[in-house]
Amino acid sequence: MTLDKTNRMNYLIDFYQELLTPKQRNYMSLYYLDDFSLGEIADEFEVSRQAVYDNIKRTEAMLEQYEERLGLFAKYEQRKLLLDQLKQLDLPSEAHVTIAALEQLE
């Protein structure tokens, strides 16, 4: 698994975790955030490794569908890019205070 995919999944989990079931949330959190192996998750929940794998793959697909429809991560990336561009401009100090406040909201 590539670092880019892991980072993307971490963001998608952050944005859409409330749309997941508790079991999906647990599996994804352990796999992506806590770096558990499929076997470790299977042992933790007393299920087969294949069951964990299937659940994670289905949940990844769901998260990608949520992102395709809602676009929260894409919008976040666009805002971050625009804020970075604003910081590079020669603006009055009051504008930089406002930019910093906007960054705190992210």
Swiss-Prot record:
<dbReference type="Pfam" id="PF04297">
    <property type="entry name" value="UPF0122"/>
</dbReference>
<dbReference type="InterPro" id="IPR013324">
    <property type="entry name" value="RNA_pol_sigma_r3/r4-like"/>
</dbReference>
<dbReference type="InterPro" id="IPR007394">
    <property type="entry name" value="UPF0122"/>
</dbReference>
<comment type="similarity">
    <text>Belongs to the UPF0122 family.</text>
</comment>
<protein>
    <recommendedName>
        <fullName>UPF0122 protein Exig_1902</fullName>
    </recommendedName>
</protein>
<dbReference type="InterPro" id="IPR054831">
    <property type="entry name" value="UPF0122_fam_protein"/>
</dbReference>
<dbReference type="InterPro" id="IPR036388">
    <property type="entry name" value="WH-like_DNA-bd_sf"/>
</dbReference>
<comment type="function">
    <text>Might take part in the signal recognition particle (SRP) pathway. This is inferred from the conservation of its genetic proximity to ftsY/ffh. May be a regulatory protein.</text>
</comment>
